[in-house]
């Protein structure tokens, strides 16, 4: 178990052994299983399952509990509610494309966002729509690939703050070659968050 108070776990769904899926499905609560069964797109279904499995593995590592001992309940339009253990850690889940991430903290409420950085998207038009002309003009003055990187960092920061749902005490950008990753917390963190990449093998969470 790490001494860091905030861990951000990241997986590429393409790297996860599908033989693990039945075990992950057995961890789902009744409300989670119902939602899981309603997904029609395989990618979205996989994002959901792996996100909940990774969250349970991460919480279990932090608390010294088996993943099956973590009970979550679905809430329409909101993050899942942690029912057991009743005094569990703060958490946030995010996904983009084949990538899924979760953050867990013993310190403060979290908001996490990840985005696949697509250099082919018209980030100037997206910035104009999302942030206004000033930001779009600022990006237009930048060379590539900095323009794309800065846009996605701003986008992730905005989404992470929205997920947090309150003023952020800190906002941290985590480096990754393919993704923009931003973690907001309700209070300043005692230590910087640590990013760990996993295939969701149980040995990764020892």
Please tell me what each predicted stretch does.
Residues 1-206:
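Core catalytic alpha/beta fold that binds nucleotide/phospho-ligands
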């Amino acid at each position: 178990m790490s001494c860091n108070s905030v861990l951000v776990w990241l997986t590429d769904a393409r790297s996860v052994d599908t033989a693990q899926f039945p075990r992950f499905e057995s961890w789902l609560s009744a409300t989670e299983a119902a939602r899981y069964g309603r997904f029609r797109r395989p990618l979205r279904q996989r994002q959901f399952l792996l996100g909940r499995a990774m969250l349970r593995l991460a919480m279990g590592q932090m608390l010294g509990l088996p993943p099956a001992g973590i009970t979550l309940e679905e809430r329409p339009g909101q993050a899942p509610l942690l029912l057991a253990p009743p005094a569990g850690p703060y958490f946030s889940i995010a996904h983009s494309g084949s990538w899924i991430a979760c953050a867990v903290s013993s310190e403060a409420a979290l908001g996490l966002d990840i985005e696949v950085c697509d250099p082919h998207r018209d980030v100037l038009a997206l910035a104009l729509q999302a942030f206004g002309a000033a930001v779009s003009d600022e990006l237009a003055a930048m060379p590539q690939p900095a323009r794309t990187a800065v846009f996605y960092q701003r986008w992730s920061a905005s989404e992470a703050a929205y997920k947090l749902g309150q003023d952020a005490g800190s906002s941290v950008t985590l480096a990754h070659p393919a993704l923009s990753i931003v973690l907001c917390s309700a209070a300043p963190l005692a230590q910087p968050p640590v990013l760990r990449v996993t295939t969701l093998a149980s040995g990764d969470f020892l």
